[in-house]
Structures are given as C-alpha cells and as structure tokens.
Amino acid sequence: MNNPERLPSETHKPITGYLWGGLAVLTCPCHLPILAVVLAGTTAGAFLGEHWVIAALGLTGLFLLSLSRALRAFRERE
C-alpha cells in the first residue's frame, strides 16, 4: 500500500539521520554520570569507574562523529 517506491522522493525520511542522531544523544559526554549509574554492577560500569578519562574521550569522539554524520544526513535531505 505505502510502498517506498511509490512515494515521492521528498517524503522519504532519512532513517540513517535519525539513527546517527540517536547515537549522538546516547554518547553525549554530559550523559557519562547517567551511564555510570545505569551500568553500575556490570562490567561496563566497572570499566567506566576505573577508566573514566578513556571512556569520556571515547564517548566524546563517538559523539562528534555521530553528530556530524546526523547533520550531514539531514543536510543532504534538503
């Protein structure tokens, strides 16, 4: 019924842009304390507790990458 081939190209929503945006929200460095609380008692939580500088740098890099990819995906839509 709503086959994507039948829809006009301007109505296609860039799903990759939304996925990259969601990853940017999850890996934002300001969410590091929330991640530490949520992951408490797990191996990932122990890693965050012991190596918080490495985790913050890694999350910041991933955040910048995913944010730039999300902005590029939404900019290509226009």
Curated annotation (Swiss-Prot):
The gene is merE. One of its GO terms (molecular function) is mercury ion transmembrane transporter activity. InterPro entries: MerE. The chain crosses the membrane at residues 19-39, 45-65. Keywords: Cell inner membrane, Cell membrane, Membrane, Mercuric resistance, Plasmid, Transmembrane, Transmembrane helix, Transport, Transposable element. GO terms for cellular component: plasma membrane. It comes from Pseudomonas aeruginosa. It is found in: Cell inner membrane. The lineage of its organism: Bacteria, Pseudomonadati, Pseudomonadota, Gammaproteobacteria, Pseudomonadales. The keyword Chloroplast does not apply. It is a multi-pass membrane protein. This is Broad mercury transporter MerE. The keyword Transmembrane applies. Broad mercury transporter that mediates the transport of both CH(3)Hg(I) and Hg(II) across the membrane. Its main location: membrane. Pfam families: MerE.
